[in-house]
Amino acid sequence: MLKLETITKKFGDKVAVNQLDMIVKPGEIMGLIGQNGAGKTTTFRMILDFIKPDQGQITWQGVPITQDIKQKIGFLPEERGLYQKLTIEEQILYFAQLHGMKRAEAREDLVRWMDKLEIVGKITDKVQTLSKGNAQKVQFIATLIHRPDFLILDEPFSGLDPVNTSLLMTEIKNLKANGAAIIFSSHNMSGVELLSDQLTMLKKGKVVLQGDIYGILDRFGRTQIYVESDVSDTDLAAIS
């Protein structure tokens, strides 16, 4: 279980995340939503121990995040990080070996994932030759090739058409069914509703809405949730 307790992070005078509490259990998906600058990426960076919170504690299975625990996390960053001149095989095996996987085992998993994501026959293609959608699929495989227990997915559907978005959603649901704890951010609100068990909405680093997705839908109906804004801050999340 991932647990964030009263997490606060400041950059100078700006409060990026303000007393955030959140729990993500194995076999559960948390949707983290909010406009750009709401604190989602900062939250991900603190979970990954890239930056430290100024206040509060983050634990996985009751233990503070360590290097060993980080090996159990799969992270899909919003800014994709593929090496353009490598083939798909070279790329994925490189990431797998960073996590201590044996080459043969990793290649077997790669072939299986390429079949699931419908990019069979491209294993020797260089990343730079791939369409945006196929490159996104390869990035997804890189995120989970080491069989992580916990996934952080930052805008996983960016660049995907509806068919491939649905394909990726199916695999995320399968990972959840196999016990993975998953937290993801997305501006695709229909995807948030379809995938999430729990929902957290941030505005300027503070939680403005949190709870079971069906409880939220029962409370507000299948409509639009408006968050009070100022002139420089327009924020609208639709759950429909």
Protein language model features and the residues they cover:
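Conserved ABC transporter NBD signature motif
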Residues: 56-69
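Conserved ABC ATPase "signature" region
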Residues: 93, 97, 104-122
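Conserved ABC ATPase signature
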Residues: 126-130
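Catalytic Walker B motif of ABC-type/P-loop ATPase nucleotide-binding domains
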Residues: 151-155
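ABC transporter nucleotide-binding domain
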Residues: 169-240
